[in-house]
Amino acid sequence: TLDRSSAASDVYKRQEQKVFQTLLQAGFEAEFESRRPALLPQDVYTFFTHTMEKFRSLGRVEISPSLLALYQVEKPKIAIETKGSLLEIGFDFANIAPAEVDDALSALFESREYFVSQSGKVLVFDEETKRVSQTLQKLRAKKLKGGQIRTSRLAALQLTDILEGQENVSFSEGFRQLAYDLRHPEEFQLPSLQVEAELRDYQELGVKWLSMLNHYGFGGILADDMGLGKTLQTIAFLTAVLRESKNALILAPSSLVYNLSLIHI
């Protein structure tokens, strides 16, 4: 609705013409009180992201609550927890009915800008949620039912880097411990070792790192320079592991067979 008193000056008249032109482009009548047919759901997104910006550039815009209700920015709560060798990521959409959550996640993973609910509301995904989706796709996460997604625990560091500090994200205690141990292997508890040799600090760190990876079911490669004691670190690690499991497959050059044969638990 335009204020008729604004037609008193040439400046306002020129402004009115701009407003009328914008109204016509948006499907309204060029009148002081203008109407247009109801927006279809697929048109709501364009109306709010493009048409409304044009109106705002011309003056103050007030939007009724009923119209605002058709367009909502969706920032779901995200919960991450460990499930065995996997990470489970749950999405809780506040404005989406439970029966539509899987369709909303599909729209998010297909990089759509918005999702249209059965009630006709246009739900726009916020930028942070879209970044999370892109990361999960790169990690080849698998969509399940009920807003759940699973991926390997190896993704813990990437997810922590992206999601740390976001108010809508919660981590289980198990996930927090996993991410911390991956970042701080030097603080992992050193197991009881059955070796007579005294390990240097960096060798002890290597054993802690191997032990931490083994604890979470990961694998790793010691890549020190030659002569820094990779064989000793491996033997020390195996003395701890073989107390719990009597089986270990060792592939080694023939020059190391004697050293490895001295492992006794």
Where are these regions (language model features)?
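Generic detector of well-ordered alpha-helical packing
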Residues: 4, 17, 225-226
